[in-house]
């Protein structure tokens, strides 16, 4: 049976609409966790103010030159802020992926599922998911930094890895290798969804300033929730594609 993107989009939309409240609560909870962790591990406002001190940063042409012109104390604060942002984002994304994928599994099995139950059921796979997302994020971002196309291509071919890890209980490297083969063989179904997801995430960043009317923490939760909903929609689509291909 031929799989058409249109039919998968329709199935994805139906599931997203029917489970919207649960998905929204998962997205909101993950956004809250991301913001709280980021706030807890980030430098204080007083420490962050060090980054704007001195004239040594004026005239820096790029990011690398900017970092080189910083004092050791400024570099330490920047490193801590970057690490806090990266860690909180990875934890939030791992919980989101686990929660959404377990929600799909449980609903497909005929169970009524709450957001907390879906996240709780994903607890056993969260450590592996966290490592998987760390590896894939690193590879994709390195590809984006070198040239845009390799980063996008890596995002496409690694798209099935979280699903294979959760659904088929694969190891991290096995899931990545299997995802590369399967996604490449079904590029016409995977590529448009991944590119659309990347564009949506980019547009959200561009419009982030629109949330400036809110307090910083509330604005961060709102932006992260919207971003999580976009990612949840992609996960539902990819899960549906994967199950159709496997069957």
UniProtKB/Swiss-Prot annotation:
The chain crosses the membrane at residues 20-40, 87-107, 119-139, 146-166, 194-214, 219-239. Keywords: Cell inner membrane, Cell membrane, Membrane, Transmembrane, Transmembrane helix. The keyword Transmembrane applies. It is found in: Cell inner membrane. It is a multi-pass membrane protein. GO terms for cellular component: plasma membrane. Its main location: membrane. Pfam families: UPF0259. InterPro entries: UPF0259. Belongs to the UPF0259 family. This is UPF0259 membrane protein KPK_3195.
């Amino acid at each position: 049976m031929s799989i058409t993107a249109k039919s998968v989009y329709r199935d994805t939309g139906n599931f997203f609409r029917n489970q919207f409240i649960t998905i929204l609560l998962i997205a909101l909870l993950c956004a809250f966790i991301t913001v709280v962790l980021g706030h807890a591990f980030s430098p204080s406002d007083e420490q962050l103010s060090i980054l704007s001190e001195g004239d040594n940063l004026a005239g820096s042409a790029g990011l690398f030159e900017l970092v080189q012109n910083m004092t050791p104390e400024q570099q330490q604060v920047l490193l801590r802020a970057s690490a806090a942002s990266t860690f909180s984002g990875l934890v939030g994304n791992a919980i989101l992926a686990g929660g959404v994928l377990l929600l799909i599994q449980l609903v497909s099995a005929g169970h009524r599922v709450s957001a907390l139950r879906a996240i709780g059921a994903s607890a056993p796979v969260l450590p592996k998911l966290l490592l998987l997302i760390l590896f894939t994020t690193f590879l994709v971002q390195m590809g984006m930094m070198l040239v845009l196309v390799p980063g996008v291509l890596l995002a496409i071919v690694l798209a099935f890895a979280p699903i294979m890890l959760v659904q088929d209980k694969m190891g991290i490297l096995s899931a990545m290798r299997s995802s590369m083969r399967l996604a490449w063989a079904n590029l016409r179904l995977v590529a448009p969804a991944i590119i659309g997801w990347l564009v949506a995430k980019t547009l959200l960043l561009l419009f982030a300033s629109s949330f400036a009317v809110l307090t910083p923490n509330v604005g961060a939760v709102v932006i992260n929730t919207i971003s999580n909903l976009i990612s949840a929609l992609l996960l539902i689509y990819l899960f549906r594609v994967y199950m159709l291909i496997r069957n």
